Amino acid sequence: MTREETQITWNAATSKSVGQASTETSDAFTFNAGCWDAAIQLSADNDGSPAAGDLIEFRILYTNGDILGDSGDDFDTAEHAALIAVLDTWASSTPGEDPARLTVPLPTMAAKGFMLRASNKSTGRAITVRARVVELVGAIS
């Protein structure tokens, strides 16, 4: 068994500042064909002084390949993507901290891969997001 770690990228960068009331989508990630377990660590770091409502929602847009038959990967649509986490950067919330980090198990469920969608619910500040996938690959010894 090996442990493979991969940084999720956003237009080839390892982090993305998501503007107030904005949404950003990561580059596509492809699972290793031998992956049998996976988790994703999410990070949200407020670009200013956090206030009430400074939240980031993370949704996962899985792909199982080319459902449309047009030769490209087809991902879950944005409004139907699964909510995997909400991180609150305001310390007075419970939970709430800046930066905020959370690790979430990913059901590999034979998915080919995914994209990550980060939606900033703040009306006043940008929030920088990062994500890292850890896969367990190969036989258990």
Features from the language model and the residues they span:
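C-terminal interaction-tip segments
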Residues: M1-K16, M109-G113, A118-S141
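Solvent-exposed, flexible loop/coil segments flanking beta-strands in beta-rich domains
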Residues: M1-S43
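Extended extracellular/luminal ectodomain segments enriched in beta-structured repeat modules
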Residues: F31-Q41, A51-L55, M109-G113, A126
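Residue-level recognition of well-ordered beta-strand positions that form the cores
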Residues: Q41-D45, R59-L61, R117-S119, R132
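Terminal beta-strand-rich extracellular "head" domains
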Residues: R59-A100
